[in-house]
């Protein structure tokens, strides 16, 4: 039995999709365990670039089972659009499985998300307005509608009527806007469910059977540790648990069945949306990193905020996610910058802090303590091993591994699959 979890160690957008796609080649099952279509991942397969939001990266391999686990919230309309997107490009989706316990995003979740974000004014958290938060709220409040309900005409109608009575009062009384009628949603979304039905099953059985039969299973996280609802920069976070512990809850696989946890990070830092960002760059170097690294959101198209590598953040990710392996991406983006900086600690009110403060007022006051390293000018996009890296690039990579306390297993020098290099095999380590 070999199972590997891929976790983002920063604020998402670390290149998890590419690494998951790369590792998918040697897995028999690929599963997502949290989030929804608020996360985007870009995969290059057969020379073609694909952008996915819900469906796991392994979908391009016909012989591999791809799982949307119970921990996700699924917009049926968005899922069908993504299926069509793949079908139109000749990609089969017969290998997809969707949990019958996954919760469903409905139009009132999208409306609630938009209205709540608008009402916060300057205190907005930067939601993607995909209905993710409200769907997870309903799940916690035990009024959510699950895939199993969507496929049952009577159950779906009964729960939809109950929920709309509540949601419409919210829209009218709190936001002074009209809600929805049952007729506006019911038939359309029930039909969506019927189109998805062929994929729906108990995915916990699928995953545990695979592991019991010694198949390699790859668990694919969305977002990143710093967006985790418990361990991220709350409240500027997502509504689920991207940390490795989210796998057990979000797929129905016990923790003893997870063997390796790969932390994916960039050689610098980026984030979309609001919230504290200690190493953020507002200068010409920041602009250069953003343009060279094409730092614009896959889902939103928003320019990402960028900054120096923050080892405090990645050490935090190592601790709360139990990271065993490091995958360092986008090293090539730093080429040509004369002096590179790595944040090794924070300083606040004269005190040195080695961990991420839970209090955001304190985090906002934190000044990064930097260590400087010389940059490199050589083109590294064709490098295929650590030894081929220029001395300064190799020293930078090694220092990142030392400061984070995570053994380097993979590094990437460009966006293509063949620019990802293996230092050690995570399935056999």
UniProtKB/Swiss-Prot annotation:
The active site is at 13 (proton acceptor), 41 (proton donor). It holds the Pfam family Adenylsucc_synt. IMP binds at residues 13-16, 38-41, 128, 142, 223, 238, 302. Substrate binds at residues 298-304. It comes from Bacillus cereus (strain ZK / E33L). It catalyses: IMP + L-aspartate + GTP = N(6)-(1,2-dicarboxyethyl)-AMP + GDP + phosphate + 2 H(+). Homodimer. Pathway: Purine metabolism; AMP biosynthesis via de novo pathway; AMP from IMP: step 1/2. InterPro entries: Adenylosuccin_syn_GTP-bd, Adenylosuccin_syn_Lys_AS, Adenylosuccinate_synth_dom1, Adenylosuccinate_synth_dom2, Adenylosuccinate_synth_dom3, Adenylosuccinate_synthetase, P-loop_NTPase. Belongs to the adenylosuccinate synthetase family. It is an enzyme of class 6 (ligase). Coiled coil: none annotated. GTP binds at residues 12-18, 40-42, 304, 330-332, 412-414. Keywords: Cytoplasm, GTP-binding, Ligase, Magnesium, Metal-binding, Nucleotide-binding, Purine biosynthesis. GO terms for cellular component: cytoplasm. GO terms for biological process: 'de novo' AMP biosynthetic process; IMP metabolic process. Mg(2+) binds at residues 13, 40. It is found in: Cytoplasm. Its EC number is 6.3.4.4. Its cofactor is Mg(2+). Plays an important role in the de novo pathway of purine nucleotide biosynthesis. Catalyzes the first committed step in the biosynthesis of AMP from IMP. This is Adenylosuccinate synthetase. One of its GO terms (molecular function) is adenylosuccinate synthase activity. Binds 1 Mg(2+) ion per subunit.
């Amino acid at each position: 039995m070999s199972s590997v979890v891929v976790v983002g160690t920063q604020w998402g957008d670390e290149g998890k999709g590419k690494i998951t796609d790369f590792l998918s080649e040697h897995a028999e099952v690929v599963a997502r365990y949290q989030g929804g279509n608020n996360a985007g991942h870009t995969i290059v397969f057969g020379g073609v670039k694909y952008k996915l939001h819900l469906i796991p990266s392994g979908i391009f391999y016909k012989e591999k089972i791809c799982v949307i686990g119970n921990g996700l919230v699924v917009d049926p309309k968005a899922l069908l659009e993504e299926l069509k997107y793949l079908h139109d490009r000749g990609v089969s989706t017969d290998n997809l499985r969707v949990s019958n316990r996954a919760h469903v995003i409905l139009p009132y979740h999208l409306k609630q998300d938009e209205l709540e974000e608008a009402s916060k004014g300057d205190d907005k958290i930067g939601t993607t307005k995909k209905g993710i938060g409200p769907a997870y709220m309903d799940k916690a409040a035990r009024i959510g509608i699950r895939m199993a309900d969507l496929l049952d005409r009577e159950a779906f109608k009964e729960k939809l009527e109950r929920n709309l009575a509540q949601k419409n009062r919210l829209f009218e009384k709190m936001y002074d806007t009209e809600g929805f009628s049952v007729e506006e949603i019911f038939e359309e979304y029930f039909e969506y469910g019927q189109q998805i039905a062929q994929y729906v099953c108990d995915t916990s059985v699928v995953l545990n059977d695979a592991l019991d039969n010694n198949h390699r299973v790859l668990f694919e996280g969305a977002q990143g540790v710093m967006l985790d609802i418990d361990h991220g920069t709350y409240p500027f976070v997502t509504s689920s648990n991207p940390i490795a512990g989210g796998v057990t809850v979000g797929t129905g696989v016990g923790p003893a069945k997870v063997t390796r946890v790969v932390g994916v990070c960039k050689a610098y830092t980026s984030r979309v949306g609001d919230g504290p960002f200690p190493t953020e760059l507002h200068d010409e170097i920041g602009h250069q990193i953003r343009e060279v690294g094409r730092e614009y959101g896959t889902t939103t198209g928003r320019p990402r905020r960028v900054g120096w590598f923050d080892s405090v953040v990645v050490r935090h990710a190592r601790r709360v996610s139990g990271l065993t392996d490091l995958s360092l991406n986008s090293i090539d983006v730093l080429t040509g910058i004369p002096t590179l900086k790595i944040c090794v600690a924070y300083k606040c009110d004269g005190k040195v802090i080695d961990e991420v403060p839970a209090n955001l007022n304190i985090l906002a006051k934190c000044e990064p303590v930097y260590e400087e390293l010389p940059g490199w000018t050589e083109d590294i996009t064709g490098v295929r091993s650590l030894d081929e890296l220029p001395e300064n690039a190799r020293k930078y990579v090694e220092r990142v591994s030392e400061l984070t306390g995570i053994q380097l297993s993979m590094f990437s020098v460009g966006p293509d699959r063949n620019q990802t290099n293996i230092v050690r095999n995570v399935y056999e380590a």
